[in-house]
């Protein structure tokens, strides 16, 4: 099994670029930069895309330009065009249930109320069996404050922790292709930014 599509979830536009909900896109942007593969807008895939080589494999990068709750449209368009199965997709997203400075790989599961994941599961024919990179952003402590929290910008101290976790996640994702998922997961799950 190999990953053929890496997606970073986000809301489009400058006003959302620095918000917690865009952590997935920060990850894909960093990966594109590390691999010297600038993302370019591609209308037929409803997002910014790039092609990279990881561990000798052709991998597509995607940051949808749809709003978060329509992310599945972009993912399904690309998966269908390149004949990519759900278990060959890695979706990077912000995760309320992990603190800033932590990131974890996961295969399958529910959407945990995340509208981007919810739409992807739906557009992949109700198939939740894709890989996720959960990027910790912390929780506001009150479920009624979640929307404002994810659409808010993290303070500098938290941003630093999130950035460090994303940096480690990018290294571990590259490692996944050379050394396998188990090694990459063990390394990423042992990491906590200070």
From Swiss-Prot:
UniProt note: phenotype after gene disruption: Essential, it cannot be disrupted in the absence of a wild-type gene.
GO CC aspect terms: cytoplasm
Keywords recorded for this protein, A-Z: Cytoplasm, Hydrolase, RNA-binding, tRNA-binding
Localisation: Cytoplasm
Effect of residue 134 to H: In rap; mutants have 9.6% PTH activity at 32 degrees Celsius, do not support vegetative growth of bacteriophage lambda and die upon transcription of lambda DNA bar sites
Phenotype when changing residue 21 to A: Does not restore growth to a deletion mutant, kcat/Km for charged tRNA(Lys) is <0.8% of wild-type. Loss of catalytic activity
Residues the UniProt record annotates as site (Stabilizes the basic form of H active site to accept a proton): 94
Site positions (Discriminates between blocked and unblocked aminoacyl-tRNA): 11
Positions of transmembrane segments: none
GO biological process, one term: rescue of stalled ribosome
Major enzyme class: hydrolase
Binding locations of tRNA: 16, 67, 69, 115
Enzyme Commission number, as recorded: 3.1.1.29
Result of altering residue 11 to A: Complements a deletion, kcat/Km for charged tRNA(Lys) is 0.8% of wild-type. Diacetyl-Lys-tRNA(Lys) hydrolysis reduced 275-fold, no change in hydrolysis rate of un-acetylated Lys-tRNA(Lys)
Residues annotated as the enzyme's active site: 21
Impact when changing residue 114 to A: Complements a deletion, kcat/Km for charged tRNA(Lys) is 23% of wild-type
Cited InterPro entries: Pept_tRNA_hydro, Pept_tRNA_hydro_CS, Pept_tRNA_hydro_sf
pH dependence: Optimum pH is 8.5.
CDD domains: PTH
Keyword ATP-binding: no
Effect of residue 186 to A: Km for charged tRNA(Ala) increases 2.8-fold
HAMAP family xref list: Pept_tRNA_hydro_bact
Function: Hydrolyzes ribosome-free peptidyl-tRNAs (with 1 or more amino acids incorporated), which drop off the ribosome during protein synthesis, or as a result of ribosome stalling. The hydrolysis rate of peptidyl-tRNAs depends on the peptide chain length, with peptidyl-tRNAs with up to 5 residues being a better substrate; Gly(4)-Phe-tRNA(Phe) is hydrolyzed faster than Gly(2)-Phe-tRNA(Phe) which is hydrolyzed faster than Gly-Phe-tRNA(Phe). Also acts on singly charged tRNAs including charged tRNA(Ile), tRNA(Leu), tRNA(Ser), tRNA(Thr) and tRNA(Val). Acts on charged tRNA(Lys). Unblocked charged tRNAs are very poor substrates, discrimination is mediated by Asn-11 which binds to the main-chain carbonyl of the penultimate residue. Acts on charged tRNA(Ala).
Domain notes for this protein: Recognizes the backbone phosphates and ribose of the tRNA acceptor stem and backbone phosphates and ribose of the tRNA T-Psi-C stem, allowing the enzyme to recognize tRNA in a sequence-independent manner.
Protein name: Peptidyl-tRNA hydrolase
């Amino acid at each position: 099994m190999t990953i053929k599509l890496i997606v970073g979830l986000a809301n489009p536009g400058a006003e959302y670029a620095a918000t917690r909900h865009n952590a997935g896109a920060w990850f894909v942007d960093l990966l594109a930069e590390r691999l010297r593969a600038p993302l370019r807008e591609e209308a037929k895939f409803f997002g910014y895309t790039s092609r990279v080589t990881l561990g000798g494999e052709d991998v597509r990068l995607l940051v949808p330009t749809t709003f978060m709750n329509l992310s599945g449209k972009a993912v399904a368009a690309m998966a269908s065009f390149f004949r990519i199965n759900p278990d060959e997709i890695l979706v990077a997203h912000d995760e309320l249930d992990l603190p800033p400075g932590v990131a974890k790989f996961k295969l399958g599961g529910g959407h945990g109320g995340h509208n981007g994941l919810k739409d992807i599961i739906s557009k992949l024919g109700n198939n939740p069996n894709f890989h996720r990179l959960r990027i910790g952003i912390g929780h506001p402590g009150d479920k009624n404050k979640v929307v404002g929290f994810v659409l808010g910008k993290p303070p500098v101290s938290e941003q630093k922790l999130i950035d460090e976790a994303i940096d480690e996640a990018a290294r571990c994702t590259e490692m996944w292709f050379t050394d396998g998922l188990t090694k990459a997961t063990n390394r990423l799950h042992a990491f906590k930014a200070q």
